[in-house]
Amino acid sequence: KTQGAINVTCFGAFLVAQEASKRMLKRKSGSIFFTGASASVKGFANSSVFAMGKFGLRGLAQSLARELHPQNIHIGHFIIDGAIGREPFGTYETINPDPIAKTYLEFHNQDKSAWSWEIELRTSVEKF
């Protein structure tokens, strides 16, 4: 069970990044995005396996950013701190997927003079 969770939350991302970066390096451009969770930066009781994978994913993204940013490959890690869904307007209990997608696109289009490698997204009512 533990190995399967690590494979899903971390190792699969490594394999995808490995293959995608080969192609992007040939083109000398591209973006690779990883979706994390609040467990990427803090552990919770009864979620150690999930945290292991998400911490690993964040470390992978950070390492790849340092390795590939100078080669014009933009690496992004997105911490989604909350449930994703479409709540009625104004309730802010879940993170609407449309603004998430907009944030990913804006990240992809960042000016090269001001690239970031990580963004946290949460609702305005989420405690952190």
How would you describe each model-predicted region?
Residues 17-18, 44-46, 88-89:
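Short, well-ordered secondary-structure micro-motifs
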